[in-house]
Amino acid sequence: MLCGLTCSGKSTLARQLAEQGFVWLSMDQDAWDAGCREQPLPPAVQRQIKVEHKRRVRELVAAGRNVVLDYALVSRARRDEYRALAEDAGARVVLVHLNVPAVELHRRLAARNAGPRGPHQVVVALEQLDKWIATFEAPADDEGAVRVTAAELTQYPHAFAEIGEIGADRETQVNIGLGQASSPSPSQS
């Protein structure tokens, strides 16, 4: 499960995990496919996508697939809800908190808003980002999140090696453009 505000790097990481074989469940992608081009999303669209994603998480995990949930997960209650869903389906859950300072989020959002549009490049007003920043509940220590700050981004992939493999019985590599590390594959152990 990925956790972080708009422009924190969730979709970039999710894309890289998808390249390693994870099934990428993205609120942004499915909203884009439904015709939504701005944030925040209409509540009815959010509800519909969440129902479908919950069904898919249960189905995919039961089938032994690795899943990356690309959501903001802005509150503990929301994180607990999705953690319980995945664990009940048999998943080993890893929570990754992408913790980027507000000034950097603003810089990234301004650049994104000025660029081309796409599922992960929708227009978000800076004022909306400020509202999300004000209400975001960072994971507590007892949630066991792998925390990643802007200053630690070059060390970020190593966090997975410290907690073990993300993917079941296979090598997992993560490259966020600033460095790369991998957890050992069974043949390297």
Task: Name the predicted role of every residue range.
Residues 29-32, 74, 99-105, 153-154:
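Conserved nucleotide-binding/hydrolysis micro-motifs of P-loop NTPases
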Residues 2:
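Hydrophobic anchor at the beta1->P-loop junction of P-loop NTPases
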Residues 45-98:
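Glycine-rich phosphate-binding loop used to anchor ATP phosphates in small-molecule kinases
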Residues 88, 134-189:
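NTP-dependent small-molecule kinase module
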Residues 39, 87-137, 179:
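A glycine- and Lys/Arg-enriched "phosphate-lid" helix/loop adjacent to the NTP-binding pocket
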Residues 22-24, 93-95, 144-148:
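Conserved beta-strand scaffold positions in the cores of enzyme catalytic domains, especially
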Residues 5:
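P-loop (Walker A) phosphate-binding loop of NTP-binding proteins
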Residues 8-65:
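Conserved substrate/cofactor phosphate-moiety recognition/catalytic segment
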